[in-house]
Design a protein with these regions (language model features):
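Generic short beta-strand segments
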Residues: 23-31, 57-63, 109-116
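A structural signal for short, hydrophobic beta-strand segments that form beta-sheets
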Residues: 46-48, 98-103, 129
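N-terminal helix-cap/turn-to-beta initiation motif at the start of protein domains
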Residues: 9-23
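C-terminal motif of bacterial Sec signal peptides marking the signal peptidase cleavage site
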Residues: 4-8
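Acidic, glycine-rich flexible loop segments
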Residues: 82-107, 113
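N-terminal glycine/threonine-rich, aromatic-flanked beta-hairpin/loop signature
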Residues: 36-84, 185-187, 191-192
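K/E-rich alpha-helical interaction surfaces of small helical-bundle regulatory domains
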Residues: 19-29, 74-75, 79-82
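Edge beta-strand at a domain terminus
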Residues: 75-82, 114-195
């Protein structure tokens, strides 16, 4: 007998509304090699996985004021389970759970809690993001590869604004951001109204 899994209609609706790009302030600063750098804003990209109704992958990009880089991008995996949104950073396994939130087609706000190895870290923060773009569904259905390449997966955008591919060729900047390869990622800090 096979195991069947079910997703709630609410979870599917939340995942559908979450898909796209959101901008706003979540983290206050990062520490990199003992130096503190202010984060001016963050950009979060959520994309549903193929044939997955309540989960997917994406990027979380922190933009810096006078930092060692203009921005740092992290790969994330996200899912909705029992109306809780789980965002996990692929690089270090840090997870943020979003609860007590409001999600519309324009705004997303709520409370974010930090977890590491499944254990709460004692940090929480109220945040607010605005919706800035959605996937181009016409391109998604007519040309699957174009959809993914349109968002720059597997590439990075340097500080000089040149978009470099993995084989070293350069093109114009992409519409979206992808991960910069960072040997030591900065430690992220929630804005200082921790509860």
């Amino acid at each position: 007998m096979g195991l069947a899994t079910f997703t709630s209609c609410e979870d599917e609706s939340i995942a559908y509304d979450l898909e796209g790009t959101w901008e706003g302030r979540v983290f206050d600063y990062s520490e990199w090699d003992g130096t503190r750098y202010n984060i001016s804003y963050s950009l979060l990209e959520f994309y549903l996985g193929a044939f997955r109704l309540v989960q997917g992958n994406g990027h979380w990009v922190d933009f810096y004021d006078r930092g060692p880089r203009d921005y740092v991008s992290y790969k994330i995996h996200w899912r909705v389970d029992n109306q809780v949104i789980y965002i996990t950073f692929n690089e270090d396994g840090t997870q943020y759970r979003v609860t007590n939130y409001h999600l519309s087609d324009r705004r997303f706000w709520g409370t974010m809690y930090e977890y590491k190895n499944g254990q709460p870290q004692g940090y929480s923060h109220d945040f607010e993001l605005r919706h800035t773009s959605s996937p181009n569904w016409d391109n998604y259905y007519s040309d699957y590869d174009y959809y993914w390449s349109n968002y720059g997966y597997g590439h990075y955008w340097s500080n000089e604004g040149v978009f470099e591919t993995e084989d070293g060729t350069a093109t114009s900047p992409a519409k979206s951001y992808s991960d910069t390869v960072v040997k030591t990622a900065p430690k992220r800090h929630l804005i200082e109204d921790n509860k």
